[in-house]
Amino acid sequence: MKSLLFVTIAVYFVAQAVTANLLSNFLGSSLIDDDKGNMHKLYKRSEDQCIGRSCTCDTSSTSCCPYAACRCNLWKTSCKCQRTGRKWATPCKEIYSPN
């Protein structure tokens, strides 16, 4: 019984591998290249986003928008992006995209 189950699972995985190989040969490698490009665009978009002023931030990253810095109280809690210098930062939005 165990050997029959093992053979069934092995045949299933071989069939999946053959189907995937035939499908990739039929469609070409353009789908794989497109996926890599799309993932790069998604990663780039997440880099462009920042946290607006007066919103909660994390001190371990530079996630605040330009002209804002992540500042915490004495006990390193309730950290928020606050204005730096004389220039004004963006209004509070949880995720702000400058582009």
Curated annotation (Swiss-Prot):
Lineage: Eukaryota, Metazoa, Ecdysozoa, Arthropoda, Chelicerata
Keyword annotations from UniProtKB, A to Z: Disulfide bond, Secreted, Signal, Toxin
Post-translational modification: Contains 5 disulfide bonds.
Propiece residues: 20-45
GO molecular function annotations of the record: ion channel inhibitor activity; toxin activity
Cystine crosslinks: none
Example of a GO cellular component annotation carried by this entry: extracellular region
Leader sequence residues: 1-19
Subcellular location(s) of the protein: Secreted
Protein's name according to its UniProt entry: U8-agatoxin-Ao1a
Tissue specificity: Expressed by the venom gland.
Family: Belongs to the neurotoxin 02 (plectoxin) family.
